């Protein structure tokens, strides 16, 4: 329900039930003028991982506050995807590619044992090959236009991890990454004794590999289809494990996505824009009013941050320069909506349409001075990286995602009536889960003390 169709912002929304302007998590990272650099959404100033930038309680905080005896655990390849949906309590587990091991904010004895008994390094020579069914489902060439590969893996199968510069990082963009998440989640069920008593527990899995695969090869690619096939089979296995360990009908689940994705730009007559191009165009527009200088500090989506030098200009000169930047970026190919952020601060409830979505995405303390959105068929990329496709726009393909709800008392393999077109706002997921857990929704709790 916001314009921030980005991993960190959406995971915070799923776990709190509140949009970015309330959670404070407006993107995967944002510019810190006091530090002179970007800071990740779950990164402390010293580089350690933290939930302190999340202004609101999450589901784990609701469980802790209710004192039900329930536990909360999350597992993901991504740190932000493990930490933010939980909140400030619970056990968040993610993959640290530098250590080639699982890690968490607080030490965990069983996780240390798990890393030792099931070392991820043993997989660094794995080779990802396509399943026999994959080509027929994809219906495109293995090396379709726009595919660039990801984290050192090339455009075509097979994909050998040890053929990359950093096999440990290449794990992120293969089905192996999801398999490792499932394996660790299954171990967490046993070691944390999840579902072993009458106190409802929470287990969150964020299966991030398909996101990386989409960025590198696109949603229509062999790689994407192959990953989905393998994921479907692994989910089936995991649900069977839940039946065996917890008991059929004794667990409930919601399956959804933090965001959608743009089809390959080549299919929509779109294209790709780098953040460097946006920054350069904005700086040229500022120079036309303010003269030579570095007037733009950062242009990472969804907002552009002016430099300290720009903000030190006389108010009238700064206002004119900002207007020129806005008009320059509006004429930039691939950008659909460019506005001054201050025009969207406050009174979000009175706004409608895109204006409402932009309003609930921005944070006066953390957002930049200018907000911009890519047009249909256009995606944003790092100039030194390159992507096949991406997400992070107002477009329906980014904002509308499937959701599967299996309420308490239902069994996973029972016949379903089939999909329908019922719309469930993402903000309803946290209250729904809280109700199942027998705890107050996170939004009803007092916010934690955060910077």
Residue ranges and their predicted role:
Residues 28-48, 56, 61, 86-88, ...:
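Secreted, luminal/periplasmic, and some membrane-associated catalytic domains
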Residues 70-76, 82-83, 178-212, 371-372:
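Active-site regions of oxyanion-processing enzymes, predominantly non-cytosolic
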Residues 277-321, 388-437, 451:
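Substrate-binding rim/cap in mid-to-C-terminal beta-strand-loop elements of soluble/periplasmic
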């Amino acid at each position: 329900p916001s314009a921030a169709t980005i991993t960190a912002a959406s995971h915070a929304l799923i776990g709190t039930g509140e949009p970015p302007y309330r959670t404070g998590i407006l993107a995967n990272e944002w510019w810190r003028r006091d530090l002179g650099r970007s800071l990740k959404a779950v990164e402390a100033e010293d580089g350690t991982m933290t939930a302190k930038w999340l202004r609101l309680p999450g589901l784990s905080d609701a469980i802790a506050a209710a004192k039900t005896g329930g536990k909360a655990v999350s597992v993901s390849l991504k740190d932000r995807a493990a930490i933010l949906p939980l909140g400030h309590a619970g056990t968040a587990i993610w993959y640290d590619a530098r250590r080639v091991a699982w890690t968490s904010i607080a030490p965990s004895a069983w996780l240390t044992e798990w890393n030792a008994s099931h070392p991820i390094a043993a997989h660094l020579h794995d080779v990802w090959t396509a399943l026999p069914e994959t080509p027929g489902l994809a219906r495109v060439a293995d090396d379709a236009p726009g595919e660039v590969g990801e984290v050192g893996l090339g455009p075509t199968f097979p994909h050998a991890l040890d053929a990359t510069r950093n096999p440990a990082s290449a794990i992120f963009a293969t089905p192996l990454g999801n398999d490792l998440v499932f394996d660790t989640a299954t171990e967490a069920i046993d070691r944390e004794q999840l579902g072993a008593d009458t106190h409802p527990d929470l287990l969150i899995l964020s299966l991030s590999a398909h996101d990386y695969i989409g960025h590198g090869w696109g949603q229509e690619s062999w790689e994407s289809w192959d990953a989905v096939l393998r994921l479907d089979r692994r989910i089936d296995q995991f649900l069977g494990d839940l039946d065996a360990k917890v008991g059929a009908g004794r667990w409930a689940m919601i399956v959804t996505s933090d965001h959608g994705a743009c089809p390959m730009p080549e299919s929509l007559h779109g294209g790709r824009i780098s953040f460097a191009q946006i920054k350069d165009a904005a700086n040229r527009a500022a120079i036309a009013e303010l003269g030579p200088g570095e007037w733009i500090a950062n242009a990472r989506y969804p907002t552009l941050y002016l430099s300290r030098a720009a903000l030190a200009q006389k108010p009238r000169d700064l206002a004119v320069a900002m207007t020129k930047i806005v008009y320059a970026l509006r004429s930039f190919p691939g950008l659909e909506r460019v506005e001054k952020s201050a025009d969207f601060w406050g009174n979000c409830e009175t706004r409608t349409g895109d204006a409402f979505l932009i309003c609930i995405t921005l944070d006066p303390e953390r957002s930049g001075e200018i907000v911009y959105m890519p047009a249909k068929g256009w995606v944003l990329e790092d100039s030194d990286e390159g992507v096949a496709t991406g997400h992070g726009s107002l477009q329906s393909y980014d904002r509308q995602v499937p959701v599967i709800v299996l309420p308490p008392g239902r069994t996973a393999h029972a016949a379903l009536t089939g999909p329908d077109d019922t719309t469930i706002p993402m903000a309803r997921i946290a209250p729904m889960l809280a109700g199942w857990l027998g705890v107050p929704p996170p939004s009803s709790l007092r916010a934690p003390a955060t910077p």
